[in-house]
């Protein structure tokens, strides 16, 4: 488990490129037949990936010890979105078939969660966010057909994109975790511009569906103290509440967003005009 401490905005603006990457970038999300796990002190979110290839993968008791509990989800809820080939997730003996871009919410208290791929030549890639939970909501599969896509932006401003809200109150109940997937139209490069912050929630972006020679310049920092991180395919970035989170790519891309914090009101955000950015 890679533990990331909270960081004050006044400290963050003094960091150089490598220091910013050390604090906020999750460089390697998927490793064959293993789980990766980054624990952030910011709202206690856990972020990572699971890619079963030659065997099944489960999160063992060693993580429970690190979290001070008996097992991983004793006091947590889990959200998973599969960006790879078809797979399965077995939760306490109940098997869910999770295809490409299908998702699974796993409620607090699930003791055994086992991840598998249907074909080792086309492994599933389970990206997950995990957050503290105060009560148990039912485990539920969510498919792209279950969400209501919302298209925003314009080709003229190179930010036409479709937002798919997987784990939001209109789709299913969670304690605090919200997740979704945003896909840019071909030829569009910007996400979340004009940008915003949200004082009451933190957020993690996971960029994927990118060519090897492509990158995203992810914008972060306070609106008047912006910085950037250069990100490549299948990398994630932690965004504190005080930070903007926007990006521009060399080509179109897709990203998964996950939020935890005070509320789940999607539009509860503090907008920042482009003219006010520095």
Swiss-Prot record:
Pathway(s) the chain acts in: Glycan metabolism; pectin degradation; 2-dehydro-3-deoxy-D-gluconate from pectin: step 4/5
Any single biological process term in GO: pectin catabolic process
Catalysed reaction equations from the record: 5-dehydro-4-deoxy-D-glucuronate = 3-deoxy-D-glycero-2,5-hexodiulosonate
CDD domains: cupin_KduI_C, cupin_KduI_N
Gene Ontology terms, MF aspect: 4-deoxy-L-threo-5-hexosulose-uronate ketol-isomerase activity; zinc ion binding
Residues that coordinate or bind Zn(2+): 196, 198, 203, 245
Family to which this protein belongs: Belongs to the KduI family.
The protein's name in its UniProt record: 4-deoxy-L-threo-5-hexosulose-uronate ketol-isomerase
Underlying gene: kduI
């Amino acid at each position: 488990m890679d533990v990331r401490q909270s960081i004050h905005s006044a400290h963050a603006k003094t960091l150089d490129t490598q220091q910013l990457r050390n604090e906020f970038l999750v460089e390697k999300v998927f490793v064959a037949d293993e789980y990766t796990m980054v624990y952030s002190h910011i709202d206690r979110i856990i972020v990572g990936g699971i890619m079963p290839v030659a065997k099944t993968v489960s999160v063992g008791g060693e993580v429970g010890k690190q979290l001070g509990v008996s097992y991983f989800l004793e006091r947590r809820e889990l959200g998973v979105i599969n960006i790879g080939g078809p797979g399965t997730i077995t939760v306490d003996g109940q098997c869910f078939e999770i295809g490409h871009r299908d998702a699974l919410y796993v409620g607090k208290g699930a003791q055994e969660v086992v991840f598998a791929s249907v074909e080792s030549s086309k492994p599933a890639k389970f990206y997950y966010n995990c957050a503290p939970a105060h009560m148990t909501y039912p485990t539920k599969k969510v498919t792209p057909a279950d969400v209501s896509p919302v298209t925003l932006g314009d080709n003229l401003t190179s930010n036409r994109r479709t937002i798919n809200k997987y784990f939001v109150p209109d789709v299913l109940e969670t304690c605090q975790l919200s997740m979704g997937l945003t896909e840019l139209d071909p030829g569009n490069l910007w996400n979340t511009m004009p940008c915003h912050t949200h004082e009451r929630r933190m957020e993690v972006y996971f960029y994927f569906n990118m060519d090897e020679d492509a990158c995203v310049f992810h914008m972060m920092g306070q609106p008047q103290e912006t910085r950037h991180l250069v990100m490549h395919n299948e990398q994630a970035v932690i965004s504190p509440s005080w930070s903007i989170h926007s990006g521009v790519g060399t080509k179109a891309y897709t990203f998964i967003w996950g939020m935890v914090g005070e509320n789940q009101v999607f539009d509860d955000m503090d907008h920042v005009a482009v003219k006010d950015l520095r």
